[in-house]
Amino acid sequence: DHTGAQYILGRINDEGMRTNPDPAEAVKWFRKAANGGKAEAQFALAVSLERGEGCVINLEEAVNWYTLAAEQGHASAQFNLAGMYAHGCGIMADDEKAVYYFQLAAEQAVASAQCNLGAMYEQGSGVEQNFSSAMHWYELAAGQGLCRAQYNLAVMLHAGRGVAADLKEALVWYRQAAKQGHAAAQYTLARIFLHGEGMDVDEVIAAKWLKLAAEQDVPEAQLILADFYLRGRGVPEDFVLAYVWFNRASSHGLDIAEKNKRQAARCMTPEQIAQAQEISRTHLAA
């Protein structure tokens, strides 16, 4: 199979398996194999054209090669092509076509495709809105460990969209997503523990999740965490850290954070303010 050999030569040059990577040489071999009908090469060539690796960016040609690979059943090509249709990259935006190709990839167990398809069913984009179908695809993607799908599934269970509200099950998925670093899931968990939704209030656990979300730059989490430090709720009282987090929240345009920062400063020594400002400079530069 000469197309297979051409594709392998492309991979060798692309990844530098035996030599230094040579993207332009890789594209040459990918194109030869792609013209011979090899789906993997068509996909690899499309990726190169989309990213401008070893060639000039050409989104229209990338769409053409993704389409040829997708029609041969290449799951990643189907997923990428769906994204091109969804965002109007290299082709006119078409939500129905996006749904079609996401569905093909989703049926081949591509977790991100399952999640995106779920979102399109939930929103009614390119397909009739159907919460049951949205849940189905979110569940499949969540079961594969995709944190975005775990969060979306939790939100639907929490709100009772298409199913009876089930906070207990929602919490399972919020936790799964939060443990993987999903900022919105971390913030939502913090609010659930803070308000005692379906459980006793636990400000210590709320503070734990607030810290994680705040570190990921969720402004509302930063604001609440700052207030926790100011009042010693769930964490030891610490005016310096209160000032730092009010400052972080203020940098996102939250006026109340700027006001609260000034109030916190009234309780602080000049040395504490200087320390807080230095920490803030380090934080904001990071």
Predicted segments — roles?
Residues 254-286:
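Terminal, low-structured helical/coil segments at or just beyond the last alpha-helical repeat
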Residues 8-15, 44-51, 55, 80-87, ...:
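Hydrophobic face of amphipathic alpha-helices that form TPR/SEL1-like repeat modules
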Residues 12, 33, 48, 69, ...:
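TPR/TPR-like alpha-solenoid repeats
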Residues 188-191, 195-197, 204-215:
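Alpha-helical adaptor scaffolds
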Residues 2, 38, 74, 110-112, ...:
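Residue-level recognition of tetratricopeptide repeat
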